[in-house]
């Protein structure tokens, strides 16, 4: 999977420590990856995905509700709905809840329509109560099948 990703300028490529490694979902080969992520930004949203702190801007702990990844993708296929597996780490520890898939924080579906660049805001992780996330170092990883296809490290201040 590294060769198709390398030809796209991607700000997170060096951050994805597990790119091309085997995950726990199985059943997907590198040739079946439907798109590559060319940009990944994180924003602070409410439970309805209204933006509280814009994607790519400073995130302040006292305002945090849902940490939401926004991905820009370059499709290899024309159409389809694809399940992504999302990992959210705080200070190196995977965040998971009782309904989280094993080894992941949550899942999100994206629907590709056409071959042009597309942007998706994935569901966030958090609470409707402001101040949910504390200061620290965080990282989102986006997985498709066995492959880490994007990652972004960020801070909550």
Spans of model-derived segments:
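Contiguous beta-strand segments within globular domains
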Residues: 43-83
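Short, exposed beta-strand-loop hairpins at the edges of beta-sheets
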Residues: 2-4, 128-153
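Solvent-exposed strand-loop boundary residues in beta-sheet-rich modules
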Residues: 46, 90-94, 146
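Proline/serine/threonine-rich low-complexity linkers at boundaries of modular beta-sandwich domains
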Residues: 27-37, 44
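Short, solvent-exposed, Trp/other aromatic-anchored flexible loops in extracytoplasmic proteins
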Residues: 1, 73-75, 104-137
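Conserved aromatic beta-strand anchor motif in extracellular beta-sandwich/beta-rich domains
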Residues: 84-90, 142
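Surface-exposed loop/edge segments in extracytoplasmic proteins
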Residues: 93-105, 148-150
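Short beta-strand elements
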Residues: 3-27, 147-157
């Amino acid at each position: 999977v590294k060769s198709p990703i390398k030809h796209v300028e991607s700000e997170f490529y060096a951050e994805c420590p597990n790119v091309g490694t085997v995950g726990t979902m199985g059943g997907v080969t590198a040739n079946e990856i439907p798109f590559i992520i060319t940009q990944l930004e994180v924003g602070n949203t409410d439970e309805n995905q209204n933006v509280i702190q814009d994607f790519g801007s400073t995130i302040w702990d006292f305002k945090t509700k849902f940490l939401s990844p926004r991905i820009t993708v370059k499709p290899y296929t024309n159409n389809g709905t694809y399940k992504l597996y999302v990992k959210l780490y705080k200070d190196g520890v995977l965040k998971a809840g009782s309904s989280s898939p094993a080894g992941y924080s949550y899942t999100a579906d994206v629907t590709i329509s056409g071959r042009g660049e597309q942007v998706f805001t994935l569901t966030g992780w958090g609470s409707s109560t402001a101040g949910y996330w504390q200061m620290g170092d965080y990282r989102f990883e986006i997985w498709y099948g066995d492959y880490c296809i994007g990652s972004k490290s960020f801070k909550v201040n």
